[in-house]
Amino acid sequence: MDEQTYALATKAAWYYYMEDNTQAQIAEVMGVSRAKVIRLLEEARAQGIVQFSFRKNDSQRVSAEQLLIDRFGLKDAFVVPTPLDSSAINQSIAQGAAHYVSDHLREDGYLNIGYGDTVSRMLGFLAKNREESLNVVSLTGGVSYYLPSVGTTAYSMHLFLTPSPLVVSSRQVRDALLDEKSLQDVSTMTEYADMSVVGIGAAVEGATVLRNGILNEGELTVLKMQGAVGDVLNHFMDKDGNLIQTEIEDRVISTDLDKLRQLKNVVG
């Protein structure tokens, strides 16, 4: 049993044995079929997860997930183990995200993806390990940021990418591009996708936006002085989640945050 399946089996067992939920209720909460819940409960017993007590690490993981759900009003949460090498954290999260998406995305479903290092890595894992072909729709411009993660496995994916840069030279250029039918068609597709996965970037030294040359250090410093703590889809926000209106915001070709909130099953 791989680590991700082990985590799902642990979660299902917690809901069933510790919180006394029915299998149907667990299926609804976890977004899987009842048959899948039954298999996970069987795996939990077979692997010794359920022994009329919970192993400390397993209990801590599910408790952490439930705390996140309760604190932020989430539909679900998935906690992955912290790797021994801290530099591999994005890789670990990407693997967990790929497993989560694969478990919850129907065979012929459409997946929206946003810009970010972890999302890019996740897409690579999905492309290599998912048996069914993928239908992928981009939530931002910047084709060059999506294709490298797919590599030679692109043949197994149907890619619908926004044909534009992520950041352009002026607001006028952005507005002109957004009027193009090719961009509008992709934007419309995002509204009907089954799931969306976006990266949550931090406004820190070594941020993806710096490594990829989207912003320079001076621009990021100005954003931080204005209260920026991170970004989603290259929209920078303060600690309370409020959008920071800047000149850079006027040049970004990206799904706006109000629209993102309306999409189905957003995973960050």
Predicted regions and their residues:
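N-terminal active-site beta-alpha-beta segment that forms phosphate/nucleotide-binding
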Residues: 17, 21, 30-32, 39-42, ...
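Conserved phosphate- and dinucleotide-binding cores of soluble alpha/beta proteins
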Residues: 3-13, 17-25, 31, 36-42, ...
